[in-house]
Amino acid sequence: MDARHNMHRTGSCTEGGFAKASARFGVVTAQGGWRKVTWGVVAGVAAVATAGSLMAPSAALAAECVNVGGTQYNAGTAAGDDAGTWAWDGADDMKLNGYNGGVIKAEGKLNIAYEGKNTVKTEPDYTGAAIKAQDGTSQKAELNITSSNSTDELNVTAEADAIKSTGDLSISGPGTVNTTSTASDGIEAKGDLSITGSGTVNAMGGTEGIQSKGKTTIDSSGTVIAKGGEGYGVAAGSDLVIKGGGKVEANSIEEAAIWAKDGINISGGSQVKANSEGDLAVDTEGSLAVTNASLDASGVEYGVYAYKGVTLDHATVTVRTSASGGQASPSSPTGTTSSSKMVPSWTRSQKESSQLRSLPETTSPTSRVAISTSATPLSRL
């Protein structure tokens, strides 16, 4: 289709990227009478995003303009390329089918439905996100990415954020989304973030793998893998909810693998693994609850820290800790380290139907396993 009459090369949809100072969540400083909690939890993956079905064009919700590969198209007229690799309805719906090109950006709401194999990549030294929804003059940003088939694939690469929304962001469907950022976040939402469906999400960032300033929900039967470099694997500015029975793997080189400001809730048969090479594995200023799910946490000196306490209910939790240099450093229930190679036994009182046990003597990083068959409130392990 011919979209040149709808082309406009000025305005914020065509502006170059912004230099992104890494938005980092600070590591929580322990307060009160106890310090970081040591814990390991085997967990399953919940992955793939929530994006809701594509909505019909609506003036109230439509994008004000989009930019595809450096060319701006204004709302009201459909646009696309002759090969059919991308098509925009002039409102809020865009389809990708074999797209291999540059930046896709919108002001306002944008629903992206991808089919087949698609690649979005920024040019060298471009300081903006590869796929981005930002606030417009009158419309708030919202980005929804979805697929229809398990063979669908979306690959996004950038020096800055790979996928970003200055509002809410959702990923859903059975397809695969791979994001790579060399200097920033793999996926970032300034609002809430949701991943739903049965697909796979792989997010790798030079700072965070996956980050939201609001609530993060992973309600998926698929797989979500998040890898952070200088930042967290998964970071939530509010609550982090993992459910749906899938697998979630979070890794970080320097920070905690999983961080949430308000609390972490893992349930529904989900399997979660968290591994940090430089800090504790799971960190929250709120509480941690694991219900009918598993958590496996590996960190340095500490496995899990939940400032407002931990609750296990029919959960399996495994924690492994090691001192710098990889030397095993067993931790006692009070949070102090011990030179003994024997993992200390659990000394906390438990409900009759709950079971907490230590693993046998080992010279490898310290490991603990907690198995509960009823709700077990704990302040720390």
Identify the function of each model-found stretch.
Residues 20, 35-49:
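Sec-dependent N-terminal signal peptides
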